[in-house]
């Protein structure tokens, strides 16, 4: 006997991402590119370079997953329909008369709708990446996690490499050095879908897809409406750190902070002592001049 919940989650898992969800993903990705300093001027002066950057933003996850599996990185170019769709979004975003697309996107309801639909595509990408890796390495769960994570959040890493080639790379924006919240959530989702695929997690795939997508959309909409990026996995990370490494990590960080404070206090004291010793020497110089 089938229940309404099963019908709902099963129908949701069979939802096609083309064209509406893909359009939302391309729109959010290209708008993020346009908001970079100098992106509009670069598009007018060098449209080909701007188009390549847009394609990296839109298909970066697929490119990185292909690299991890030793597949041709340009494999995404074989999907002509999606390339034409993403190129159309890039063109109307950058070259639409009177910038009508950007003006329409500036309304918060449209941003919330597009961002929520983009998070739905993230779930599908993770599931596709896990299944793709399983085709090469059956039940190789480490590879499956890596490829699922790369497919879902690899766009940020690929665009960081693009910024490095252009000379605009900054260490604080590198996903390898400092993972963002979407990158962490994608890694968590890749782990869950991998364990579900290898039957280590007792839940059906369509149920997990539905619940994980609801979680992603809720968090994303909440962060955008409150304009607060403080929704993080810090409590979970702190708990996991205590379980695996104890409290030594916290004590080490506290000792580092104390070590940073001590040199500054010593430096101020030494400078004060130098100021205190300066008047006698200057007085001696004046006395010699008077003699």
From Swiss-Prot:
The subcellular location is: Endoplasmic reticulum membrane
Q: Where are the transmembrane segments?
A: 17-33, 48-69, 81-99, 104-122, 139-156, 180-197, 207-225
- Which parts of the chain does the record assign to the membrane side Lumenal? 1-16, 70-80, 123-138, 198-206
The keyword Metal-binding belongs to this UniProt entry's keyword annotation: no
What's its membrane topology?
Multi-pass membrane protein
Per its record, the protein catalyses: K(+)(in) = K(+)(out)
List keywords of the entry alphabetically.
Endoplasmic reticulum, Ion channel, Ion transport, Membrane, Potassium, Potassium channel, Potassium transport, Transmembrane, Transmembrane helix, Transport
Query: One GO CC annotation, please?
Result: endoplasmic reticulum membrane
Q: Which InterPro entries match?
A: TRIC_channel
Recount the known activity regulation.
Answer: Channel activity is activated by increased cytosolic Ca(2+) levels and blocked by luminal high Ca(2+) levels.
Region of interest (Disordered), ranges: 254-291
Tell me, in one coarse class, where this protein mainly resides.
endoplasmic reticulum
Q: Name one GO biological process term.
A: regulation of cardiac muscle contraction by regulation of the release of sequestered calcium ion
Which residues are noted in the entry as a 1,2-diacyl-sn-glycero-3-phospho-(1D-myo-inositol-4,5-bisphosphate)-binding?
118, 122
- Presence of the UniProt keyword DNA repair in the record: no
| Single annotated GO MF | potassium channel activity
Coiled coil (residue ranges): none
Cytoplasmic side residue ranges read: 34-47, 100-103, 157-179, 226-291
Signal sequence, renumbered to the chain: none
- Compositional bias (Low complexity): 264-273
Describe the subunit structure: Homotrimer; conformation seems to be controled by binding to diacylglycerol (DAG).
Q: What does this protein do?
A: Intracellular monovalent cation channel required for maintenance of rapid intracellular calcium release. Acts as a potassium counter-ion channel that functions in synchronization with calcium release from intracellular stores. Activated by increased cytosolic Ca(2+) levels.
- PANTHER family in alphabetical order: TRIMERIC INTRACELLULAR CATION CHANNEL, TRIMERIC INTRACELLULAR CATION CHANNEL TYPE B
Question: To which protein family does this belong?
Answer: Belongs to the TMEM38 family.
Designated name of the protein: Trimeric intracellular cation channel type B
Task: Give the source species.
Answer: Rattus norvegicus (Rat)
């Amino acid at each position: 006997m089938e229940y309404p919940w099963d019908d709902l989650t099963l129908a949701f898992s069979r939802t096609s991402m083309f064209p509406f969800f893909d359009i939302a993903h391309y729109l959010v990705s290209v708008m993020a590119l346009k908001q970079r300093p100098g992106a509009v001027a670069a598009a007018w002066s060098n449209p080909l370079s701007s188009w390549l950057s847009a394609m990296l933003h839109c298909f970066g996850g697929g490119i990185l997953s292909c690299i991890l599996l030793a597949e041709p990185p340009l494999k995404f170019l074989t999907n002509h329909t999606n390339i034409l769709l993403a190129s159309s979004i890039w063109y109307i975003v950058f070259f639409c008369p009177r910038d009508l697309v950007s003006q329409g996107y500036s309304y918060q309801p449209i941003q919330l709708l597009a961002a929520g639909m983009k998070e739905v595509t993230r779930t599908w990408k993770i599931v596709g990446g896990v299944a793709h890796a399983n085709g090469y390495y059956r039940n190789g769960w480490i590879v499956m996690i890596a490829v699922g994570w790369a497919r879902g959040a690899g766009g940020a890493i690929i665009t960081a490499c693009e910024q490095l080639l252009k000379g605009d790379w900054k260490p604080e924006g590198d996903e390898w050095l400092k993972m963002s919240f979407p990158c962490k959530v994608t890694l968590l989702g890749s782990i869950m879908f991998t364990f579900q695929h290898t039957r280590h997690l007792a839940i059906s795939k369509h149920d997990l897809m539905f619940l994980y997508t609801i979680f992603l959309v809720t968090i994303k909409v909440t962060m955008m409406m409150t304009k607060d990026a403080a929704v993080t996995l810090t409590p979970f990370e702190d708990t996991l750190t205590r379980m695996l490494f104890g409290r030594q990590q916290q004590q080490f960080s506290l000792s580092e902070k104390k070590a940073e404070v001590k040199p500054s206090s010593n430096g101020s004291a030494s400078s004060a002592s130098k100021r205190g010793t300066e008047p006698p020497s200057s007085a001696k110089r004046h006395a010699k001049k008077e003699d």
